């Protein structure tokens, strides 16, 4: 538990202290956000706000994770694990793709960075590497970081994918979650605040898996998850980094996370869902991100078939803005929805555990 607190605290401190440094540096360099012309008129005043703040989130994540392990040496805590390093690597790789996207936007002074093909290729390389490596590194109980079984709260024994399909599934999750968080990052603090809630829920899940791991506590309801405590450190560091960044990103935002942050955080969700064996549960806990992405899919599909729009604008947080809601009202209510989804997900997780032990 101490390591988890250290990870969150260090990440928060690094993120909250580094972000204003980045604001000044990026402002000096002219690294400002371009705004969609067709977006809400109120957003035009945000043009030029520094972007690529995801650098601070990634720095906080790395500092929190490695700092907690360095402190852990003092009381013989376990070192870094395959699962933790894989999720950290996937998060960083997606952050790198986002950084390139942001940098091109800034240099070309437009709201479009990497083209769709280049972005998909970047996601593909990161996801395939993660998927292949996730089936290696067998540890205690012959567990690997990933599993060829589809999972809800634990592996579903009757649904086996095979290694090739598993790697393809990893790409689907990485692409879906990174794009979902990217689409949600359209209002000040919306993505950072929502991610803090989701990662907070996953701190609880991973710590519970650690306390009830089949390796150390075999019996009814135990979890076959490799390195759950190390995954808890990743979640705690990620949550702390998001909260520290949110201090400066809350409305009115002094800096945006950009694709550097949103793609990285989406990659983290994908990696965590795979390594914690909660691929389907993540859909519930991350329901806000799912809804934002679904609103875009629905809008495009309906418009192409009927030339009509379901929403005034997609992602649908803009729909409510155009309906007259103040931006801060949309943000706070969406945070509440994210909190409710996280609470429902935790309830489902615990109820499955009670059912497993016969409670």
From Swiss-Prot:
Record's GO cellular component terms: plasma membrane
InterPro entries xref list: Glycosyl_transferase_4, PNAcMuramoyl-5peptid_Trfase, PNAcMuramoyl-5peptid_Trfase_CS
Pfam families cross-referenced by the UniProt entry: Glycos_transf_4, MraY_sig1
Keyword line: Cell cycle, Cell division, Cell membrane, Cell shape, Cell wall biogenesis/degradation, Magnesium, Membrane, Metal-binding, Peptidoglycan synthesis, Transferase, Transmembrane, Transmembrane helix
Cofactor: Mg(2+)
GO molecular function: metal ion binding; phospho-N-acetylmuramoyl-pentapeptide-transferase activity; UDP-N-acetylmuramoyl-L-alanyl-D-glutamyl-meso-2,6-diaminopimelyl-D-alanyl-D-alanine:undecaprenyl-phosphate transferase activity
EC number(s) per entry: 2.7.8.13
Bilayer topology annotation: Multi-pass membrane protein
This protein's record includes keyword Membrane: yes
Reaction catalysed by this enzyme: UDP-N-acetyl-alpha-D-muramoyl-L-alanyl-gamma-D-glutamyl-meso-2,6-diaminopimeloyl-D-alanyl-D-alanine + di-trans,octa-cis-undecaprenyl phosphate = di-trans,octa-cis-undecaprenyl diphospho-N-acetyl-alpha-D-muramoyl-L-alanyl-D-glutamyl-meso-2,6-diaminopimeloyl-D-alanyl-D-alanine + UMP
Gene Ontology biological process: cell division; cell wall organization; peptidoglycan biosynthetic process; regulation of cell shape
Transcription recorded as keyword: no
Superkingdom classification of source: Bacteria
Pathway: Cell wall biogenesis; peptidoglycan biosynthesis
Annotated function: Catalyzes the initial step of the lipid cycle reactions in the biosynthesis of the cell wall peptidoglycan: transfers peptidoglycan precursor phospho-MurNAc-pentapeptide from UDP-MurNAc-pentapeptide onto the lipid carrier undecaprenyl phosphate, yielding undecaprenyl-pyrophosphoryl-MurNAc-pentapeptide, known as lipid I.
Protein family per UniProt: Belongs to the glycosyltransferase 4 family. MraY subfamily.
Protein name (database record): Phospho-N-acetylmuramoyl-pentapeptide-transferase
């Amino acid at each position: 538990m101490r390591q988890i607190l250290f990870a969150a605290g260090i990440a928060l401190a690094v993120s909250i202290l580094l972000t204003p440094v980045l604001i000044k540096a990026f402002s000096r360099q002219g690294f400002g956000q371009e705004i969609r012309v067709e977006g809400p008129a109120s957003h035009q005043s945000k043009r030029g706000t520094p972007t690529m703040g995801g650098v601070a989130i990634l720095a906080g994540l790395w500092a929190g994770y490695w700092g907690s392990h360095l402190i852990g040496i003092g009381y013989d805590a376990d070192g870094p694990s395959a699962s933790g390093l894989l999720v950290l690597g996937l998060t960083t790789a997606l952050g790198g793709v986002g950084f390139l996207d942001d940098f091109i936007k800034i240099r070309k002074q437009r709201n479009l960075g990497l083209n769709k093909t280049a972005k998909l290729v970047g996601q593909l390389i990161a996801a395939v590497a993660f998927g292949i490596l996730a089936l290696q590194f067998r540890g205690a109980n012959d567990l690997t970081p990933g599993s060829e079984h589809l999972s809800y709260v634990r592996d579903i024994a009757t649904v086996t994918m095979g290694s090739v399909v598993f790697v393809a599934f990893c790409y689907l999750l990485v692409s879906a979650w990174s794009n979902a968080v990217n689409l949600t990052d359209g209002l000040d603090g919306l993505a950072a605040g929502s991610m803090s809630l989701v990662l907070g829920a996953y701190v609880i899940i991973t710590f519970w898996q650690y306390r009830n791991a089949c390796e150390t506590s075999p019996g009814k309801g135990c979890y076959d998850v490799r390195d759950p405590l190390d995954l808890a450190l990743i979640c705690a560091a990620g949550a702390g980094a998001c909260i520290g960044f949110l201090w400066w990103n809350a409305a009115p935002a002094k800096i945006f996370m950009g694709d550097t942050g949103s793609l990285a955080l989406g990659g983290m969700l994908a990696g965590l869902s795979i390594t914690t064996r909660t691929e389907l549960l993540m859909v519930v806990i991350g329901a806000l991100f799912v809804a934002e992405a679904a609103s875009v899919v629905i809008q495009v599909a309906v418009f192409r078939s009927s030339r009509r729009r379901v929403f005034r604008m997609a992602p649908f947080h803009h729909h409510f803005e155009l309906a007259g809601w103040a931006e801060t009202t949309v943000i706070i209510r969406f945070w509440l929805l994210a909190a409710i989804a996280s609470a429902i997900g935790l309830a489902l997780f615990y109820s499955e555990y009670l059912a497993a032990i016969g409670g």
